[in-house]
Every structure is written in structure tokens, then in C-alpha cells.
């Protein structure tokens, strides 16, 4: 069974407040997206990479990210949709004819550059034996359910996990889940949710608190500290 990475990076990054989309901001001298792709390019597990970005950014991404950094595993750069879910579906459809039904697809945020080879390996192994694998970390803070500014519930922290990526599935499973959601016009908050609603079980894989998604200026400060430790 082959393993393919699907990297959605079609977001506009409004919360970052930058003049360019967040995936192209420099982190240790390289665009964040390039840092992320580098992990999958170097991984012996990964056979190919599909990147999903806004249609008007495809030439820039090809020249300034993929070709400039020599990412030979990138099979296709796909135009994204209005929502992340549509972008992932576009990527899955682009894999048709390349990915087999039982091949593993690692869906990973383009602005989450600190994922490790260990996490990729455990997510892949879990997806091969289950309906899906969700990388996550236990919640450290108490979480409150709030309605109209009033606390209505305090879930047990022991049952709460914070979802990260990659989220890993066999191609046939995740393609079917996305096609059903698209047909029913259902918009989920992540890929695992679409698989769960079909009655399938997704198993948790322990992630890493450093596997952050860079969304805000505060995240960028944290990422810069991490990259300083990582670089020689």
C-alpha cells in the first residue's frame, strides 16, 4: 500500500494580518509551506505529495516553493475551494488514478511545519488497521461549554483531546466520506468528522504539543522559537 500526503494550503490567513498569505511567510528563511513540505519530501514513508492552494497562486507555488526547494515528490498542485473541506475534496479527486482504494492518505495542514517522522509513521500504521487515525493531544486546560455568555457545562478534561494533523485514512474511506458530505451539503470541522458521521471509527494517535498550526501572530512567535532550536 502506497502513502500519499494531501496538503491543503488554500486559506487566506486573515487572522495573521499579514500582506501575503500565511503559508508564504518566512520561517527560518523558508516559507512555512516549504517547511511543511520538507518533512514529507524527506519521509521514506511518503510516495507522493498533492498540494492544494488558491488557483491564482499555483504558478507562484510551483516556482517559489516546489521547484525552488526541489520537492520532487510533489505530483500535483491543485486549485482549492472556498472552504477547506472543498479543497480537500478537490485534492482527493485529483488523486484518482494515482491512489488506490487501500492506499493511505495523510491529510496535513500546510501551516503545521513541526510534524515529526514518528507521528507520520504511527498515523500511517494506525490508518492501515482502522477506519482512520486522528493525531491529537490531551487537553491541558479546563474547557467550558457556553451559551449566551453563560457556562452550561464543564466536560471532563480526561475525555477531551485537541485535534491536530495529519489525519490519516485509506483512500476509499476518506474519498467516500467527502463525496457523501458534498452531496448532502454537510460542512464538517475536520476530515475525521466526515468519516465518523458514516458510522466508522477513527482511532486517536498521540501527537505533540509542538505540532502547532500557525494561524495567528502569536503562533508565529512560538514557531520562530521552535525553529531556532531546530536549526544548526
Swiss-Prot record:
One BP annotation, GO: isopentenyl diphosphate biosynthetic process, methylerythritol 4-phosphate pathway
UniProt site positions, description: Positions MEP for the nucleophilic attack: 157, 213
Record PROSITE patterns: ISPD
Site entry: Transition state stabilizer: 15, 22
Enzyme class: transferase
Pathway: Isoprenoid biosynthesis; isopentenyl diphosphate biosynthesis via DXP pathway; isopentenyl diphosphate from 1-deoxy-D-xylulose 5-phosphate: step 2/6
PANTHER family: 2-C-METHYL-D-ERYTHRITOL 4-PHOSPHATE CYTIDYLYLTRANSFERASE, CHLOROPLASTIC
Protein name per its UniProtKB record: 2-C-methyl-D-erythritol 4-phosphate cytidylyltransferase
Amino acid at each position: 500500500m502506497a502513502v500519499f500526503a494531501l496538503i491543503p494550503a488554500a486559506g487566506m490567513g486573515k487572522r495573521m494580518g499579514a500582506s501575503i498569505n500565511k503559508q508564504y511567510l518566512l520561517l527560518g528563511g523558508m516559507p512555512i509551506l516549504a517547511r511543511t513540505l520538507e518533512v514529507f519530501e524527506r519521509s521514506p514513508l511518503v510516495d507522493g505529495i498533492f498540494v492544494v492552494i488558491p488557483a491564482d497562486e499555483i504558478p507562484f507555488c510551483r516556482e517559489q516553493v516546489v521547484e525552488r526547494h526541489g520537492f520532487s515528490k510533489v505530483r500535483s498542485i491543485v486549485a482549492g475551494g472556498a472552504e477547506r473541506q472543498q479543497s480537500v475534496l478537490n485534492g482527493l479527486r485529483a488523486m484518482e488514478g494515482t491512489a488506490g482504494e487501500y492506499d493511505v492518505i495523510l491529510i496535513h495542514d500546510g501551516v503545521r511545519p513541526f510534524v515529526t517522522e514518528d507521528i507520520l509513521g504511527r498515523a500511517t500504521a494506525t490508518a492501515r488497521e482502522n477506519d482512520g487515525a486522528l493525531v491529537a493531544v490531551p487537553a491541558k486546560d479546563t474547557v467550558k461549554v457556553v451559551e449566551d455568555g453563560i457556562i452550561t457545562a464543564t466536560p471532563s478534561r480526561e475525555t477531551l483531546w485537541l485535534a491536530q494533523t495529519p489525519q490519516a485514512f485509506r483512500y476509499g474511506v476518506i474519498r467516500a466520506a467527502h463525496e457523501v458530505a458534498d452531496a448532502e451539503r454537510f460542512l464538517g470541522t475536520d476530515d475525521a468528522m466526515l468519516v465518523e458521521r458514516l458510522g466508522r471509527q477513527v482511532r486517536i494517535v498521540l501527537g505533540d504539543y509542538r505540532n502547532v498550526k500557525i494561524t495567528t501572530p502569536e503562533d508565529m512567535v512560538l514557531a520562530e522559537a521552535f525553529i531556532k532550536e531546530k536549526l544548526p
